[in-house]
Amino acid sequence: MRDRILAAVCDVLYIDEADLIDGDETDLRDLGLDSVRFVLLMKQLGVNRQSELPSRLAANPSIAGWLRELEAVCTEFG
């Protein structure tokens, strides 16, 4: 799951993993995440925009935060 999130983030934000200064806790807004790119990432990750998940992801815009939220959703429904 982490690799999928990382690949999507790197693709949409045009960054490399080395740009994550604080590792997976790096605030993606510091790397160019804005509302348009957020929507692109939600599409790329297959997140249902009608669910509450996008707002939970927006509250913690980091790879680590997204991994926690997405794994929790997979556990809830898995």
UniProtKB/Swiss-Prot annotation:
Residue numbers bearing the O-(pantetheine 4'-phosphoryl)serine modification: 35
Query: Which Pfam families did the record assign?
Result: PP-binding
Q: Which residues form a coiled coil?
A: none
List the Gene3D superfamilies.
Answer: ACP-like
What are the protein's UniProt keywords? Fatty acid metabolism, Lipid metabolism, Phosphopantetheine, Phosphoprotein
Q: Which InterPro entries match?
A: ACP-like_sf (IPR036736), PP-bd_ACP (IPR009081)
Q: A single GO BP annotation from the record?
A: fatty acid metabolic process
Write out the pathway annotation from the protein's UniProt entry.
Lipid metabolism; fatty acid metabolism
Q: Which cysteines are joined by disulfide bonds?
A: none
The source's superkingdom equals Bacteria
Please give the cofactor(s) recorded in the UniProt entry for this protein: pantetheine 4'-phosphate
The residues covered by the Carrier domain are 1-78
The knockout note for this entry states: Cells lacking this gene are shown to be highly attenuated in a mouse tuberculosis model.
UniProt lists the family membership as follows: Belongs to the acyl carrier protein (ACP) family.
Cited function = Acyl-carrier protein (ACP) involved in the biosynthesis of a unique class of isonitrile lipopeptides (INLPs) that seem to function as virulence factors in M.tuberculosis and to play a role in metal acquisition. Is the dedicated ACP for the loading of activated acyl groups catalyzed by FadD10.
Q: What is this protein called?
A: Acyl carrier protein Rv0100
From which source organism is this entry?
Mycobacterium tuberculosis (strain ATCC 25618 / H37Rv)
